[in-house]
């Protein structure tokens, strides 16, 4: 009896332990699935954010215009990712979403690569870093082959191509910037030599500001910006120098014209004097320059007399003078007495 009880107790114990173990495994599995779902949800949020940014960047680069078919295919891939998420297949949703983001970024890079290569060719910058230019070209040629089969590798290759082309551009503009700075320095020195008038100081300060920004860009290794800044500063200095020179030339011409006019007047006066010279004792004749002293201020400011005497014409004055002389003569004759005894 005791043996049977012992066997029964042990069986019951094993049964309880078995149920407990199964419950623990199921609970652990559920907890693991919950953790995985939480991780997938967090990853999905990051992928969706990256996907939105990648699509915006590709659109701003006009990849949808230059690659309309590829862009439409990526949008379809993006749609499949959303459908998988709705079906709670987060793993698939994340995989499709990540691939779509890769392709958007690759198309955006292809647009940047085309622009950088055109800039290199237009400005003949390849000679400043030939090795990087060669590597950039090689990487660019591999992008399309990887685009369909391996979106991650295609994106990585496009990044490499863009990096090499940027190195070429930096090397080229660094050298060009140094030359442009020298040109700007020479232009600034030429402006300083002509002495800027106070009225033109604002233009000079503006040119100095452009030069200062170019220096800041150069110190930050932004050589393309520094090259453009130094070039603009040199142009501003040269323009201001030309304005000053033009104004001075205009003033010199005016002075020369006045001098020529004065010389012509003197010549005409000399010719007139030769044809009809004034006698040296003539009224107003003088070989010395006439100095006219200004009237006193109180005289200049004195009010005019409204009842001032009218000027008598010269002819009338002469007639009056003659009559006065004749009248005086008659008076003298009438008062003269005969001398007694006559002339001895």
Swiss-Prot record:
Its main location: membrane. PROSITE patterns: PROKAR_LIPOPROTEIN. One of its GO terms (cellular component) is plasma membrane. The keyword Nucleotide-binding does not apply. Residues 1-21 form the signal peptide. Residues 260-277 have a biased composition (Basic and acidic residues). It is a lipid-anchor. A lipid is attached at residue 22 (N-palmitoyl cysteine). It comes from the Bacteria. The keyword Lipoprotein applies. It is found in: Cell membrane. A lipid is attached at residue 22 (S-diacylglycerol cysteine). Residues 312-322, 335-344 have a biased composition (Acidic residues). Residues 257-344 are annotated as: Disordered. Keywords: Cell membrane, Lipoprotein, Membrane, Palmitate, Signal. To T.pallidum TmpA. This is Treponemal membrane protein A.
